[in-house]
């Protein structure tokens, strides 16, 4: 049996949140990733003049670390920014929960 590839890109729902006085992007609750996990992505996603606080995005991300530092989700900055409607996010998270069972 092969070890699980933790560096593969996976679809993840993330959202803009206020964190320590700044706007940051973190995973939406209900997935395999902690909501405290940082997401490195395009700065445009945290620009509240474009996307209001609480906007949910669907990204292709991989779990990584930088030279043994803390883990974070990496999203290539050149990827298309996909905004999810709240209903679409609920469907995505519901499908994710069913797959995990």
Predicted feature descriptions by range:
Residues 15-17, 40-42, 76, 84:
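A structural detector for beta-sheet-dominated domains
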Residues 44-59:
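Short nucleic-acid-contacting surface segments enriched for D/E, G, S/T with interspersed K/R
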Residues 1-19:
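Structural detector for short beta-strands of small beta-barrel domains
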Residues 29, 43, 61-65:
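Short glycine-rich, polar/acidic loop-and-turn segments at beta strand-coil junctions
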Residues 19-22, 68:
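Short acidic/glycine-enriched loop/turn segments that link adjacent beta-strands
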Residues 21-38:
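Short, basic/aromatic beta-hairpin or loop at an interaction surface
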Residues 64-96:
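OB-fold/S1-family single-stranded nucleic acid-binding modules
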